Amino acid sequence: MEISHSAAYAAAGVDITAGYKGVKLMSADVKRTHIPGVVSDIGGFGGLFAPDLTGMTEPVLVSGTDGVGTKLRLAELLNKHDTIGIDCVAMCVNDVICCGAKPLFFLDYIAIGKNVPEKVAAIVSGVAEGCVQAGCALIGGETAEHPGMMAADDYDLAGFTVGVVDKPKVIDSGRMAEGDVVLALPSSGFHSNGYSLVRKVFDVENADLGRYDDELGETLGEALLRPTVIYVKPVLRCIEAADVKGVSHITGGGFYENVPRCIPDGLCAKIDKAAIKTPAIFRLLQKKGGIDEHDMFNTFNMGVGMAVIVSPETADAALSALKAEGIDAYVCGEIVAGEEKVVLC
């Protein structure tokens, strides 16, 4: 008897029916991200979006793509997959907001060893939540089953976003000047960077991730899996309220690699390390791993997920705008003359 295509494919390790079930399970989560501009429904060959460009004189599209990295291993060890998608969205939208762009839509890509519909739907529920927090629509995605290439439980997650900003309103660091103020927007922890080192130091494969830690005030697993903060709405509100001259998403490479990306030649962001409010999880990692201070600031966000540089006259307005969106930002430095672009002292 001739084997049907789907049966033959299933025998090779790819379960098409699991894919169909996954789409059905995630449909409600996807639809709750839909905002004005969404034209297509889930399941089409392409995601359609008609942006409202009213009031823009020269709209510019801004794209960003990223993944979650080895933080995914924590999700697997804890068997908790419904928040990791927030990280995926955050890593993309927090990048495009650095030039002042509002994210419009998002697409995700999941590569997985074995397609378990409930697991995939949980991952996508996190992606949807991230999109809701960012105010963008989830208009498409792909789940690819990779038998023979990935272990059954393994998966990778990546995403792609497109935003828009009116060209005259693109954040221009060329206007930055001595005396401008550096604001720190608190992070929720490691966010989605440095997890290869984190996993090694904490020996997560053998650690009791569910044990309550008095120093942390929570379990180690909770501290390590906490989702990345999405700064889109707070930063957009800050841009409306203040004279924003630079925004830096503090990701891999920490302060030393990310702050200079928004600092023009001849100027330097002088950061007061004593002002930085660093969560206990960072100090615990530093102590346990014997990591020196410079390496910590050159690898992790150290409690600052985003740095926003504003004119001194509008610093209070910026802080108030961020506070109104639930972000307790604070001053952590100033712009001075210099060639190093960032100095921590």
Put a short name on every predicted segment:
Residues 22, 26, 48, 92-93, ...:
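Buried hydrophobic packing segments
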Residues 23, 121-124, 195:
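Hydrophobic face of alpha-helices
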Residues 15, 66, 179, 249, ...:
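Residue-level signature of catalytic and energy-coupling elements of molecular machines
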